[in-house]
Design a protein with these regions (language model features):
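Extended alpha-helical targeting/anchoring segments
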Residues: 1-478
């Protein structure tokens, strides 16, 4: 085991282990963050990270903020920046980018506070709006070079331990877990989940018509409408097993599993929200979707139709404009450019049109401001953004939770990477919930939009009983 000293930041080079093997060893831990590049190997699916035992855990729930379980009256933004200021070390090149720091999720509903969007009363749900840990120990994986590291940030235990074991003790314990022999576990999920559709087909049609009327009246050009499925979690189905059983069926580059004790998040997202690498900003919104076909000729036709679709291209252009405006507020003037427009990308069950916008930050301290400026993502709100969010707040039947918020990390080295948690299930109070939706524009066809929304989560919800009747609100899957 090789150790490299860099200020208080240490890098331990370990024998390579598959991230899933290590995840299975730590799966009973709470406050666990597993940022899982599960897609086909590539630049978007090169690095994975696993972190447990945060020095600090910040939770926002029912409009109250808790630090390590104690309610605090704080300015969240200032607190997060103060935590990042604990240690700002120079990035070590040639190793994965999350070199200790903050990691967790921000919900869509918390983002409404940023833009002062009124939250219309929804069904009672005290799902935590934010869960973020400050991690001084992070396992990192370079899947391309087959390397595993333990990143360690040695801090003054008397000042930062917050009643945890001393840093060195925790590091030794994590390394001992790493060395444990791996026992192969079955990831077969034999549970038959009964998914309940929260919004009936009739309600869905009514709300899409309402959105189109807003568009025709000039309120908006596009908005993202979503609906939810829920299922009771069987007693013998663990949260991590639910994640693993669908991970290989989705194979997305920005997958993640987070377990904060009272809530778990299983994200199978294909969409990058914000990446910061050496102060260079990248955002890659998705707009434009069609289901794949096992018939190669048919699949090629579907791809060609998607690429040539004026409707989908128009949706994509609108959202590119929203994201370009959002990052321009923080990036250096003149640095924001559209790098790619409506490129076709293929995932396990759908084809998408993906655009890429880039910019440059002045300093590391702009990262939080960048996130605040961009949250929630333009691809899951609409255009103009604020009015679209107001309409979403009016029409959504339930709070979105982590869906359409953000999951990722901010490294002490100044890098950051967040997904937009679409194709994401939340497990809370023994209930599994998953949302699906899409952008609605003036010429949207209601039946087509409904089917497209279901297609997006078809690898998670395998609906054997197609909903041929409006009142049939149950989909049975196995």
């Amino acid at each position: 085991m090789k150790k490299i000293l860099k200020n208080k930041f240490r890098v331990f080079k370990l024998d390579f282990i598959d991230p899933i093997e290590l995840f299975r060893k730590f799966e009973t831990y709470s406050n666990l963050v597993f940022l899982d590049s599960a897609g086909p190997l590539g630049e978007d699916s090169r690095y994975s990270y696993l972190a447990v035992d945060p020095l600090y855990r910040i939770k926002v729930q029912d409009k109250k903020t808790y630090i390590n379980g104690k309610e605090k009256k704080i300015c969240l933004r200032n607190t997060l920046q103060s935590l990042l200021n604990i240690c700002s070390h120079n990035k070590i090149k040639g190793i994965p980018h999350f070199q200790c720091g903050l990691s967790g999720y921000v919900s869509y509903d918390y983002c409404l506070n940023i833009d002062n969007i009124p939250q219309i009363d929804k069904k009672k749900n005290n799902f935590p709006d934010l869960n973020i840990g400050l991690y001084d120990l992070v396992f990192a994986f370079d899947l391309k070079l087959k390397k595993t590291f333990l990143f360690s940030l040695d801090l003054d235990d008397t000042k930062y331990s917050q009643n945890l074991e001393p840093h060195i003790t925790r590091r030794k314990r994590l390394l001992n877990f790493y060395k444990l022999p791996y026992i192969t576990h079955s990831i077969q999920n034999n549970n038959k989940l009964k998914w309940k559709q929260e919004t009936s087909k009739r309600e869905y049609k009514t709300k899409i018509k309402k959105i189109i009327s807003y568009i025709n009246n000039g309120d908006i050009f596009q908005t993202n409408y979503t609906h939810r499925f829920t299922a009771k979690k069987p007693d013998d189905l663990s949260d991590n097993l639910f994640y693993l059983s669908y991970r290989n069926k989705t194979k997305t580059p920005f997958s993640a599993f987070l377990n904060f004790g009272d809530v778990s998040v299983c994200s199978f997202s294909p969409e990058r929200f914000i990446k910061v690498d050496n102060l260079k900003v990248t955002t890659s919104p998705i707009k434009g979707t069609v289901k794949t076909s096992s018939n190669k000729i048919r699949d090629n036709v579907l791809k060609e139709n998607l690429i040539k679709s004026e409707k989908n291209l128009a949706e994509n252009l609108m959202i590119v404009d929203v994201l370009r405006n959002d990052i321009s507020k923080i990036c250096i003037k003149g640095s924001v450019k559209v790098k790619a427009l409506a490129e076709l990308r293929t995932y396990k069950n759908v084809h998408h049109l993906v655009s890429t916008i880039g910019g440059k930050l002045e300093s590391q301290k702009d990262i939080l401001n960048l996130l605040i400026s961009c949250l929630p993502g333009g691809s899951v709100t609409g255009a103009p953004k604020i009015r679209a969010m107001e309409i979403i707040s009016e029409l959504d039947k339930s709070k979105r939770g982590v869906y359409c918020g953000a999951i990722g990390y901010i490294s002490f080295s100044g890098d950051a990477d967040f997904n937009i948690p679409i194709r994401t299930a939340s497990i809370f109070n023994n209930q599994i919930s998953i949302n699906c939706g899409g952008g609605i524009v003036a010429d949207s066809k209601i039946e087509s939009e409904f089917r497209e929304s279901i297609d997006k989560i078809s690898n998670i919800i395998k609906d054997r009983k197609r909903q041929s009747k409006e009142n049939n609100k149950r989909i049975v899957i196995k």
